[in-house]
């Protein structure tokens, strides 16, 4: 079952909980003249997610399909969506296009350079290249500048059946999850290198009002401070 929550005006969180691993997989539909779906989900999730989208819009209205980095939970169902929605187009960064998407996708993507913006009607999105943050050479995030929503992928990942939105201690949750992952076969799923702090600081400087996280609760507290605190937590946990 997909849980649907409007976390900001016309910004919808579509959450599928994987009981086997105790983790939410969140996908975001942003309504506008040209609707954007951010995260396609796994290929196996396409039937369930597409049914959830139908509760909000006619799927064929989707114009843009985006994600952070080339990974199955991010864009595994991309070609299923492109087949179902003939007018939809992928949108991704230059590295993602050159390394993976140009070959993988059944239609070519709109390619964005670092800092480039595009509009969907009333909204303007900025692509921010964030190599290896959270992970992947091609990683990037999308910042919706109109309402200041940061679609931040795996940053702040935390486990469990959690509320759709919180203004509580999201960094504490993320730190606990990082520490647990470090004790598992999935250790260092997020790296920390000499550029990580600078990248997280640049995201904090965007002054987002909402962090739309892929795994766990979205956050509407002090987002800039949360990003800076996440840098500290990641550095302390991942560089021991």
Can you say where each PLM-predicted feature lies in the sequence?
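Conserved beta-strand hairpin/beta-sheet module of binuclear metal-dependent hydrolase folds
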Residues: 2-54, 141-152
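Active-site metal-binding motif and surrounding structural segment of the metallo-beta-lactamase
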Residues: 45-91
């Amino acid at each position: 079952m997909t849980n649907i929550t409007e976390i900001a005006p016309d910004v919808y969180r579509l959450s599928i909980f994987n009981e086997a691993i105790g983790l939410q997989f969140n996908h975001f539909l942003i309504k506008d003249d040209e609707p954007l779906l951010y995260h396609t989900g796994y290929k196996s999730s396409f039937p369930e997610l597409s049914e959830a989208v139908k509760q909000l819009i006619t799927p064929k209205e989707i114009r843009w399909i985006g994600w952070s980095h080339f990974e199955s939970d991010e864009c595994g169902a991309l070609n299923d969506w492109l087949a179902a929605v003939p007018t939809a187009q992928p949108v991704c960064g230059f590295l993602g296009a050159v390394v993976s998407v140009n070959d993988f996708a059944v239609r070519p993507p709109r390619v964005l350079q670092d800092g480039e913006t595009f509009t969907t009607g009333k909204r303007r999105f900025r692509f921010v290249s964030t190599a290896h943050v959270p992970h992947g050479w091609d990683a990037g995030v999308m910042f919706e500048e109109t309402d200041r929503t940061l679609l931040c992928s795996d940053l702040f990942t935390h486990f469990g059946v959690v509320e759709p939105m919180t203004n509580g201690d999201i960094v504490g949750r993320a730190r606990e999850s990082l520490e647990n992952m470090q004790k598992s076969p999935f250790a260092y799923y997020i790296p920390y290198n000499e550029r990580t702090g600078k990248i997280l600081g640049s995201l904090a400087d965007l002054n987002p009002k909402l962090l739309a996280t892929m795994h766990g609760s979205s956050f509407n507290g002090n987002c800039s401070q949360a990003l800076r605190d996440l840098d500290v937590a990641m550095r302390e946990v991942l560089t021991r």
